[in-house]
């Protein structure tokens, strides 16, 4: 496995429901609320009295289920669903989840959000023992581990399998008589439990999906925890005691929808606090604040309230383009920036603009937006980022594969400022980020994973370790 060339990272959305006669349709609505987490493919798997049925395909959820018959056939009171964005594997339906596994004595489905850091080693070992993989993502590994376990009970098999996989993961599994969800020992990826008026139980990557189907949040799944949902109700269990909360800080910064709550913290509120703290750390004179739509608008509001500068709509987003960070190729990302934003000359002309954005990954978007604002007549553009400098890869489930593609890993703040063409560049401090999010916990770093900013990973990197250490010695120039 070569870390620089290929990673298995995914950023996806998972949803499941047990105990509702329209389970698949509600899963469709739930996935619609999670569409921002992945647009490459989607699928739904239903349970109709023990019979598992599935439809999946490439594209947006609405495209996958454009024919109503594909959803109508997914009858039953239980269902799981998945929206996918991935860097692993070919762009084919084989990699679209949920996966469905049929054996002579059982069948089950699986949906996964995250990335396994020991996937290559596990896959090699399993293949040497005769396992045959039908997809190229790491999500299939858990099913093989479950099936090959010698533990006599199903829960014993699942616990054993979960203890063998490492990294970041949120799994939802659908069996003939139950739905099971599990979270990694650090809770890198969020997973919440909700309940509907009729007693149906819902599991989702984000709480925003509960609102659209009328479910009430019960609680978030804890690190290392398993929830078993069947006709008898809800049962919580764990597969390890070696846990420590380190939820991905990028969920609060960028990925999650503003109306979602993660570990008791509303995402919009956290972003506003990030913006306010950013304003306190900002040291330049300016006339107006312009937030980059849409994920930066909450931070811009906080910046405005703290700084006293007026908030202006200096950038307009075409709502029918996809998010550039989760476009699968760099060429598409650059095209996406050109398509999705335009500057309002009547607002920014002759003004010193504070451009508030959530993050700088490759610098593609920032450079283009600064150019747009200056072409529209802004006299100065001061870029203020509502997160620390993103200088290290993520191995737990985000498409940040290598240091070579991170501008902050290869250039100083001043060099980055020059590359994007800004008059100044200010990043939020790591301490400011942790304080702004404010999870109530005594875990290190306020219960957050901030390894993308300081390189201090909360777990061993396993298969990635050797190549990652080597990459620390390499540099890539972003100057053009």
Language-model features: where?
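Conserved short alpha-helical segments that host acidic/polar catalytic motifs at enzyme active sites
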Residues: 1-223, 228-286, 292, 380
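Flexible loop/turn segments at secondary-structure boundaries
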Residues: 22-24, 87-88, 118, 188-189, ...
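A short acidic (Asp/Glu
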Residues: 55-56, 183-184, 299-302, 393-395
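Generic beta-strand/beta-sheet core signal
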Residues: 111, 174, 182-183, 194, ...
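Secondary-structure transition/capping motifs at alpha-helix termini
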Residues: 131, 151-152, 283-287, 305-312, ...
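Phosphate/diphosphate-binding loops
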Residues: 160, 208-209, 216-217, 221-225, ...
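PRPP-dependent phosphoribosyltransferase catalytic core
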Residues: 162, 177-178, 214-220, 314, ...
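Short, glycine/charge-rich flexible loops or terminal/linker lids adjacent to PRPP-binding catalytic cores
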Residues: 308-353, 364, 391-401
